[in-house]
Each structure stands twice: as structure tokens, then as C-alpha cells.
Curated annotation (Swiss-Prot):
Keyword DNA-binding: no
Residue intervals passing through the bilayer: 13-33
CDD domains in the record: cyt_b5_reduct_like
Membrane topology classification: Single-pass membrane protein
GO process annotations (BP): protein histidyl modification to diphthamide; tRNA wobble base 5-methoxycarbonylmethyl-2-thiouridinylation
Chain ranges of the FAD-binding FR-type domain: 44-147
PROSITE patterns according to UniProt: FAD_FR
Identification of the protein by name: NADH-cytochrome b5 reductase 1
Family, as annotated: Belongs to the flavoprotein pyridine nucleotide cytochrome reductase family.
Pathway: Protein modification; peptidyl-diphthamide biosynthesis
């Protein structure tokens, strides 16, 4: 792999022929293109990023925007993976994992959607941040990496802030020319105000040319609600499955089920999937698994 130092060594013997100005110009162009799409995330070293904006999405959830060092920088996070966020709380370092809702196409910043829990150390820490304060981040982390057309159909089941990895995958797929992956999302929440990124999700569905469908499910729906009611059921999951899936000889062939949400919900979903005939997800899922748990 070329670096500035390696390039300089290769050009040095020809400096007298090329002339100092030409060598400098070549090095300058190399530096420009090397820095143009710089990825700033590091898997080992903690790096600090400043909070530049905070947008309250609901009574207990906010979107936090953090600036990257340069406007042309990208985070460098593969689709489907997450980052570690660290904070010093009561003299101890506390670390939690979050999936940004931005892609590497979104230059100069990254966004985190975080629900504040009363006993959530990092979520409370983030909620108290003021503009200009920093968080420490490293990554990428995770076993799942989305690539276009990796499966004919992705069935995604999310609850609450478990929408973030699903949203990232959906957003990337819809924006990628040539990606024909069918996407089905079941998104569960308690009440309508808890539905995160609904406007953005609905916009992606409108742009998908029919290959992305979403079913919202609420425990406490408002009057006139036309989506799902109660908890996510086995029947709701079956409806989201491809037509060649449930009850056929090639049951489940070629598609994946992705899940992310509160532990009680995930436990219930495992039971539903087992009844339909799907394997139980591993405690630590791997990319090749048909049922992947974030």
C-alpha cells in the first residue's frame, strides 16, 4: 500500500529530471486524494468527536450529531456494524455500543439516535451533553456487514431504538443502484410518539419502487390507527416472509431474518420463529446465520 513516504522515495531518484516543482505537485495531488475520502474511525484508538447538534425526536429520545475533523471525512463504518462510545462516569470508564444512522456518504459528521433510560449511564451522559462537548468513540465492531444483494429478501424485526441498524441497512440498500434486495420491516413500539425515524422510513419506502415494505405495531395505538396492534405475532412475521418461505419445500431458502430490540421482545420473537421453522440465533450471531441478532 502506497503512503506519502513510499511515494516520495520512489520519486526521489528522478527529482533532478522532473524538477522540484513537478515532484511537489505530484506529492500535493497524492496528499489531496488520500485525504479527500479519509476515514477517521479506529478499531483500537479512542477518538474524540464534538457534539454539534441535538434534535429531540420524542420525550425520551434524541438524535445527536457529532462533527468529524474535516468536512470531507467519513466515519469509515461498514453498513450493519456499530461503534463503541465511552464516557468517564463516577471515576470509571463506561462503554456502550450504538449504530449510527448515517452512512459514509454523509460526510463531515455522524448521527446517533439514543433513548435516555433512567438507569442508563451512557444514555443519560449523552442527554446532558452540551454543544461543543465531546465523546470518545472507536470501532467498527460487529459480525454483520451488509453488501448489496447478499440475500434475495431481508426480514427485519425491530423494537424501539433497535431500529437503528435496520434503518442504516435499509437506507444503504435503497440508495445503492443495482441492489435488488427485498426488504420487509416489522417495527414495534408502545405508542405512536415512540416511533423513531418514521418520516425517514416512510420516505425510503416511497423511493423503493415497491421493494421495501414496513408494518408498524403499537401496544397502545391511537384512535383510527391502521397498523398492527399489540405485540408482534407469529402471523405478522409470516406475512412478511417471502411467498416461497413458510410451508414450502424450500422454506426460508436464500433470505435472512434480522432482529434488534428489548430482551423480552427478542425472546418472544425467537419463540415465533421456532414455530415457523427457523433455527434459534446463536448467542453471538455470525454473518452466515439465517437468523441474525444484533
Amino acid at each position: 500500500m502506497f503512503t506519502i513516504e513510499v511515494l516520495a522515495q520512489k520519486l526521489a531518484p528522478h527529482a533532478s529530471f522532473l524538477g522540484g516543482l513537478v515532484v511537489a505537485a505530484i506529492l500535493g495531488l497524492f496528499i489531496f486524494f488520500q485525504e479527500k475520502d479519509r476515514k477517521v474511525l479506529d478499531p483500537v484508538e479512542w477518538r474524540s468527536f464534538k457534539l454539534v447538534d441535538k434534535d429531540h425526536l420524542s420525550h425520551n429520545t434524541a438524535l445527536y450529531r457529532f462533527a468529524l475533523p474535516r468536512a470531507s471525512d467519513s466515519l469509515g463504518l461498514p453498513i450493519g456494524q456499530h461503534i463503541s462510545v465511552a464516557a468517564e462516569i463516577n471515576g470509571k470508564q463506561v462503554v456502550r455500543s450504538y449504530t449510527p444512522t448515517t452512512l459514509d456518504d454523509d460526510k463531515g459528521h455522524f448521527d446517533l439516535v439514543v433513548k435516555t433510560y433512567e438507569k442508563g449511564n451512557i444514555s443519560r451522559y449523552l442527554s446532558l451533553l452540551t454543544i461543543g462537548q465531546e465523546i470518545k468513540v472507536k470501532g467498527p465492531k460487529g459480525k454483520f456487514v451488509y453488501t448489496p444483494n447478499m440475500a434475495p429478501h431481508l426480514v427485519m424485526i425491530a423494537g424501539g431504538t433497535g431500529i437503528t441498524p435496520m434503518y442504516q441497512i435499509i437506507k444503504s440498500s435503497i440508495k445503492t443502484p443495482g441492489d435488488k434486495t427485498r426488504l420487509s420491516l416489522i417495527y414495534a413500539n408502545i405508542q405512536e410518539d415512540d416511533i423513531l425515524l418514521k418520516k425517514e422510513i416512510d420516505e425510503l419506502q416511497a423511493k423503493s419502487n415497491g421493494r421495501f415494505d414496513v408494518k408498524y405495531v403499537l401496544n397502545n395505538p391511537p384512535e383510527g390507527w391502521t397498523g398492527g396492534v399489540g405485540f408482534v405475532t407469529k402471523e405478522m412475521i409470516e406475512e412478511a416472509m417471502p411467498s416461497s418461505g413458510v410451508g414450502s419445500a424450500n422454506h426460508g431458502e436464500g433470505h435472512k431474518v434480522l432482529m434488534c430490540g428489548p430482551p423480552p421482545m427478542i425472546t418472544a420473537m425467537k419463540g415465533h420463529l421456532a414455530q415457523i421453522g427457523y433455527p434459534a440465533p446463536r448467542s453471538v450471531s455470525k454473518l452466515e446465520d439465517q437468523v441474525f441478532l444484533f
